[in-house]
Amino acid sequence: MARTDQGLGAESEPLTNQSHRHSNSFSSTDSLSTDGSLFGDDMNATQFQKSTQLPEETPYRDIEEGVEGEPESDILSHPRDKSKRSRGSRWIWVIGLLCLGGWILAFILFWGRRNNNSDISSSVAAVHDAESATGATSYGKPLTLDSVLNGSWGRRKHSISWVAGPDGEDGLLLERGEDGKKGYLRVESILSRQNETDADDGLILMESGTIEANGKYLQPSETWPSPNFKSVLVAVDAVSNWRYSFTATYWLFDVKTQTAQPLDPDAPKGRIQLASWSPNSDAVVFTRDNNLYLRRLDSTTVTQITKDGGKDVFNGIPDWVYEEEVYGSDTATWWSNDGKYVAFLRTNESMVPEFPIEYYMSRLSGKHPSPGLEKYPDVRKIKYPKAGAPNPVVTLQFYDVESTDVFSVNVSGGFADDDRLITEVVWASETKVLVKEFNRESDVVRTVLIDVGSRSGDVIRVDNFAQDDGGWAEVTQSTTFIPADPANGRPDDGYLDIVVHDGYDHWGYFTPVNNSQPILLTSGPWEVVDTQPAVDLRNGIVYLVATKESPTQRHVYSVKLDGSDFQAMTDTSKAGYYDVSFSIGGGYALLSYEGPHIPWQKLVNTPSNQQHFEEVIEQNEHLFSMIEKYALPAEIYQNITIDNITLQVVERRPPHFNPIKKYPVLFWLYGGPGSQSVDRKFMVDFQSYVSSTLGYIVVTVDGRGTGHIGRIARTIVRGNLGFWEARDQIETAKAWAKKPYVDKDHIAIWGWSYGGFMTLKTLEQDAGQTFQYGMAVSPVTDWRFYDSIYTERYMHTPEHNPTGYEHSAISNMTALQQNVRFLIMHGTADDNVHFQNTLSLIDKLDMGGVENYDVHVYPDSDHSIYFHNAHKMVYDRLSSWLVNAFTDEWHHVGSALAAT
């Protein structure tokens, strides 16, 4: 299920972010060859940051370990001018001192009344007043909902489009901008950013932001240079298809002549679904009308590779469910490293049932109806396999570029056609490819090594999670090939993969490739993050991101391929959330600090590169000016232990928090398997608005089933989604209801997508005992309505687990009737969580005589709810509905009497 993050308007974004399919950005994913550790033997992230002398930061709103307002080390500080501080006036100090005495008295009274909860372990040693909790921000004005929704609080984050130089040059990046003396598209050395006056303009690939073809000027939608920088693949007039996929007309742009020609001269207007360069820059493979084609650059002839593509058969691209739930992209074509073979997925969905999506206000198909039919809805039918329905049948095929043969390789002992998922394809050498196959319920994984030269294959590893712990295998795209290098102590090929060790996800190094027992690179009661690691091949060093310090944090670490010398590359003495990306050759790195303080990004040279370089590329100065204008809530990170499982909690307290006052509490959650909502990222979102402006406490707990807490806590939810997760929300709410500053009669819960399901499931399970209100947006209400690959991973098939599906569905109308009131909102054109879910629930509510709920429907909106101002309307409705709940307005509505 693609997540919809309820932050900074992110509820409007589907659960996974969109990505450009041919992006040249490498985020901790590339094989490196460096001469040393990332920041040097004596250079950790703190030292790296200090060399820039970034100015001091105003303390932000994160409270940890009872110390708030204490300046972080430079690694956590944000560049800003001290002169911008404007709240040190004499009168404020006088008033502050007067208030301090009153606060101390209130503080003593509060602690005298406080109930000790043995099941809660808080990282806050004391309750802080608003000033100490939020620093200068508590003196500002309340947040506005518009400022949250319009992106004013969005953090700017840059991705570096690193590109490999044709002759092995490192530190090259792709720049795309406006027309000018430097050109529209150019390859630039990172060193040119350091001294722009002396540096050249790099290699200009496209001088203008338009291309002339057939007497017309065309505007590029996307551009992808060839590996040798002599040509550019240009997509024009891109039209979105599903979450990641789109179609466009494609052109080959010659850098030398600055002229363009159609990718397929015989079909210049043909809508192409996917195109990608050969590693040798001599050919482009592309999919059109679900068939695969090859265009060599030394000819205008296009070779058709497949001929069976059509309505039910896809070649080289995924269908809806594989794009959504397996690859997270529109790509199912993989060139071999030497450009002699193309691996591609063939998908046959002829047995997959169609689901109709109706559009009442718009024409997504682009077709104009015949006269007299204008008032009928536009209907789009999507092959959507629901739980228990037939899945698409997938096979991996190969194309030999020289012989033009198309073939597949049968490996004995495989899964049946209706029980096979192909989840990952990684070329391991010029002729060998690693393939991961899952069974339908995603609890048995076969790793297969295929040799396309001999057209043979072997199963090199089988992981049976059903037997091991009763859990599931998550789909990953992070397997990394490690080539043999006897001179550097690697006699055999190998690969990195995430393995389960003592109940936690860790990196393992399998060498030789057919070895089923890995060298453990990491271990311990914490987990690595599922992103491809960067590898220094010369020195045998792996760079990775992990949660070693806390599930809510991300730090960068290095470890040798033999599992020794594990080191932190960022400052782990302070709470932090980091990301990192490396240049192709490993000479440069982009370190991104994402929280809890103001995010920043910095480029540096790594020790393998003796030429010093460092540049702060993003400081997010606008956020500093924003936090000085607005009062923001304090964020207090805590732990709660339920059934001997420790869970992460964050409590957002309103500015000027008064410990002797009673506050309503809103719980916000997502809660899907493997997800995370409690983290140390900087975020000002709808929850911040609710706390800052509406004055309510907002609590989030990552319950069982969520990510980075170990498999025991994660996999317990299998087969009965919603039960344990709802219990964790209820038990946490009970603990908060006992707090002296909480109004236990005004506790609500809300969420979107899986969070919408969890909202309803929690209200159903609690039956009004703890929660009185709930707001569910785009909720799943019965897992038999959701797609098969996601659902069966966590629930098994309906045939295997009919009781589990019955229990997980929202079905107890009597229990829902015990709540004061709840709200349901859904887009009618939701192609992810179908509107059918809400309609089915409403039918149950009608049959049960339940009336204590409201429904808001958004015509033609998909899962993100954006169409025709719907995005703003969602949050306006959430906000006003919540105010009515916490001011007892819904009590009056619920007991309304007929006029006499």
Swiss-Prot record:
Its main location: membrane. The keyword Protease applies. GO terms for biological process: proteolysis. Residues 44-55 have a biased composition (Polar residues). Residues 1-90 are cytoplasmic. It catalyses: Release of an N-terminal dipeptide, Xaa-Yaa-|-Zaa-, from a polypeptide, preferentially when Yaa is Pro, provided Zaa is neither Pro nor hydroxyproline. It is found in: Vacuole membrane. This is Probable dipeptidyl-aminopeptidase B. It comes from Talaromyces stipitatus (strain ATCC 10500 / CBS 375.48 / QM 6759 / NRRL 1006).
